[in-house]
């Protein structure tokens, strides 16, 4: 179906806690030796499990996980907010672990399902029920209010701000984003290609302060 002899990067989409990290590493390396895949990454694994897997791989002369995919963006949320205990969301402990791991992190839901532009325009009442459940928290409201204040002083792309938040990480990181129309996608990719920062470090400090 894929019309290819091998997969460059094979993603394990969910962790399976019935198996030890070492068992999973062994199976992935079997596929690498057989030529089915070149590398493997993990999606919705905790950093702790990734560390265990990669430590096992290193001690046995095997290939470990080369990339991770978790929920990561300016919009803070939790698995409980999503109603799904099998996903992993970026938090302080995960962030510090990735600073040690230094493997690429692909952040999904980096746009927080449009939470910030919707909230800035119309408050909580402008949000759909699913977005409200996942993202309408005190921390995210504070961040939205600060973005709104900055918008009064300078013009910038909210879509690109969402991407810039992930790209400014202290480890390799990439955003996974979508757009409702072609112009939005061109806007995001245009900003990415020019590589220009919209916010200063001082402005980011204002947005990310944990107190009102």
Which residues fall in each region the model found?
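Beta/alpha (TIM)-barrel catalytic core signal, keyed to glycine-rich beta->alpha loops juxtaposed to Asp/Glu
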Residues: 15-212
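Active-site groove signature of glycoside hydrolases
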Residues: 1-20
